[in-house]
Every structure is written in C-alpha cells, then in structure tokens.
Amino acid sequence: MNLSHLNTGSMKSNTGVSMKDVGILVLGHGSTLPYNKELVESLAQMIGKNHTGPVRTAYLNMNLPDIQAGLKSFEGTNVNKIVALPLFLAHGVHTRQDIPQELGVDPEKRRGILNIWGEEVEVICAEPLGVDECIAALACKRAEEALR
C-alpha cells in the first residue's frame, strides 16, 4: 500500500511543532503469538519511513517492552513530545483506561507532562485508528484476497 500521501516527515504539525522533535510510541496489545509482535514492529518501521523523529514500540500485555520501558527508550533522542499511537481499531477499556494509566496521563485529557528520564516530556495519547478510507480500502483488499 502506498503511504506517500501520509508523509509528514518534513512537515510541521498544525501547532508549529517540528515533527523531528516528536517521538512516536506505537502501542500493540501484545500476544503469546510471536506474529503479533512482528506485525507491530513491521508497522512501526513503516511509520518510521514517514516520520523524521524516532519511532519505538511497546505493548500493553504479554510482550516487551512494556509501555514504561517504551517511554524510557526515547532517552537521548532529544524529543520533547511523545505521541503514543495505539494500534487499536476502536475505543474500549484499553484505550480509555489502561493505556492512559500505563502512560501516566489523565484519561480524560489523554495527555500530560511527565518526568521520564530526568526531563519533562509531553506525552500525548492518540486516538485509535477509527473509521478511515485507508482502512476501508484495506478491508476490501482482504476480502478480494479471500476470494483467490
């Protein structure tokens, strides 16, 4: 799938923040099946191709690194913001409660200033993937593949 239209690497966010100063923490649920972790890591690598800042992975359950270790993995990268990006389709207890709690941010505001490695860093919890044309196109592709 061509993601070139999503390239934000050299762009600034609508708040004027340089994206190279923003880390992305890709969050997977975690699983005892190794494929789950491989999938999350592969998607994080793809995201990294479209983002100039560092991209890391972490897992809510069963896999390492856990979310706290994932946050700490940005030490030395000079990021001043970390966006936690849950690879979940829709909101549920994990995105509303568990992930914000593990991140140490207010579940309502979904963001907070944390002292992670002796420096204050803003941590922002992104929304789940939700409804999007890209996901609909991927679903259609998977349906077509099932017919082969």
Which residue stretches match the model-derived regions?
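Active-site-proximal alpha-helix that buttresses catalytic centers in soluble enzyme cores
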Residues: N2-R148
